[in-house]
């Protein structure tokens, strides 16, 4: 694999010390990893500090670590937490860089070809480059990723071999450096200086790496020798310091040298002729014409520019892989001895297993109708067994591990004690007869104590009817349906915490960000109807929503007790018993979590104020609108910096609305 340039140690920074059963969980996990155990499960109850335990393990075993989460929001939260725990190490973020992505597709029934359309988020693209370059430069790296990490990325060997290495005293002509930069897909632009570009002024070449957003490098020549290299502010040109070595990584992950490109183009040409013969034999003349025209254009672009839109579809030829061979992914950028941690594994594993099939069926349609060569099928996510072949050592992290994880290992390490001393809630089963009036009484009791209630139903109609009824009864209630976007969902949770309303009704309250310490009652309607949300895991996760309040209580409304209900009740009672014994032994009084009510993230507070005032932008004069745009621009940038891209997009839309009036 690739040799690392620096060999640093992980250094964990935290004002907390491991407490509860964190110390034994950390010790067991570390001992097992150092003992060579391949797979283990950290079964941590909600609110027991699993991320802190993961951080302790990483710092002690000192291996490059890949943490996989099941969506961007969760990955962003974990990235922020790990950044705080490891300020001196490389904590990187690797998720899909598309703000918007419409994959290339063909619908035969209506003869509709949908061209690939996407909007790439520049900030995330920078972070992806930062992740891959960090993995090749050092070993103290944590990459927090979504399942994007199992998608094709280009050869790490080609990527590493293409690095342009510069140091003062190196004999290289200015023109040779410019050619080398163009070869690794850097673009010359003397006016608009951005990531992945360089500019030239006499004997000075300024390079803006793809993994940076503020700092560039100034390479000064004396004849055909590098005189010195300085780090500079990209915007102002202010010198920040001198560097004695500079590694410039390619501006794209799909990079191929000239020799390999010639071979790849020849293979693409040969495959094209083969496929054209197949189409002609089958009488598919339209498909043959379409494929010939598209592929020949791409070949011309590859020859002239070394790149074409959709270059990833030719990655099999460019990487020199055989048919059916797995693509290179982020996992190949790690050294052999690395650690994988899968957060919320009961959700994430399902995603890893399902990615391949969906991608395959869409691409087969494109191949069959002459939009792509058959080799495009090998630009794909990894299959489950291919992902498993990359696993050296893995920790599955979940409150409710799935069947897959339990099949992989019998080593289950429990983390049940919460640092706050909070107990799992008491669970009781009540009959469905008169359940709504019974529930109304329970809600009123909570409202008097300024506490909140979650109600989970099985159908949309039931949720809507219940919400309408409670509104008539004078209860401040909201219904959270599946169409609500992440940002709106976060705002609803904030309003619930602030007491804008007291009751939240929903079908699936298991999504991320639904942990509300103010919730002391969780009511589960139709608890005896078996299914995804009423199986043992679903019930345990739902019960966990009341585990952040010292008054936490769960009522299941059901006429029979199913096996799933019984197992969930028994497991909750088992955990509660262990927690109570620990609290008694150590004299701990459970305290409700005191969690600051942030307005999504701090930067949105100003926006919220604007919204609260309900400013009529039509009534603002030109100068006031200009000032509002400036404010919004600043807030948008701040949102991007803390990786809240959905908020940034919302602010951007507000800006466009204001600008449209001028």
UniProtKB/Swiss-Prot annotation:
Any single Gene Ontology cellular-component annotation: excinuclease repair complex
Domain UVR: 626-661
Annotated ranges, domain Helicase C-terminal: 435-601
Major localization listed first in the record, in broad terms: cytoplasm
Keywords, sorted A to Z: ATP-binding, Cytoplasm, DNA damage, DNA excision, DNA repair, Excision nuclease, Helicase, Hydrolase, Nucleotide-binding, SOS response
PROSITE patterns registered for this protein in UniProt: HELICASE_ATP_BIND_1 (PS51192), HELICASE_CTER (PS51194), UVR (PS50151)
Pfam name, any one: Helicase_C
Motif (Beta-hairpin): 97-120
GO biological process: nucleotide-excision repair; SOS response
Annotated compartments: Cytoplasm
UniProt-annotated binding residues for ATP: 44-51
Ranges where the Helicase ATP-binding domain occurs: 31-188
Domain of life from the UniProt record: Bacteria
Any one GO MF annotation of this record: DNA binding
InterPro entries assigned: Helicase/UvrB_N, Helicase_ATP-bd, Helicase_C-like, P-loop_NTPase, UVR_dom, UVR_dom_sf, UvrB, UvrB_inter
Domain notes: The beta-hairpin motif is involved in DNA binding.
Subunit-level organization: Forms a heterotetramer with UvrA during the search for lesions. Interacts with UvrC in an incision complex.
Family indicated by similarity: Belongs to the UvrB family.
Function of the protein: The UvrABC repair system catalyzes the recognition and processing of DNA lesions. A damage recognition complex composed of 2 UvrA and 2 UvrB subunits scans DNA for abnormalities. Upon binding of the UvrA(2)B(2) complex to a putative damaged site, the DNA wraps around one UvrB monomer. DNA wrap is dependent on ATP binding by UvrB and probably causes local melting of the DNA helix, facilitating insertion of UvrB beta-hairpin between the DNA strands. Then UvrB probes one DNA strand for the presence of a lesion.
Protein's recorded name: UvrABC system protein B
Organism per entry: Streptococcus pneumoniae (strain P1031)
Organism lineage string: Bacteria, Bacillati, Bacillota, Bacilli, Lactobacillales
Name of encoding gene: uvrB
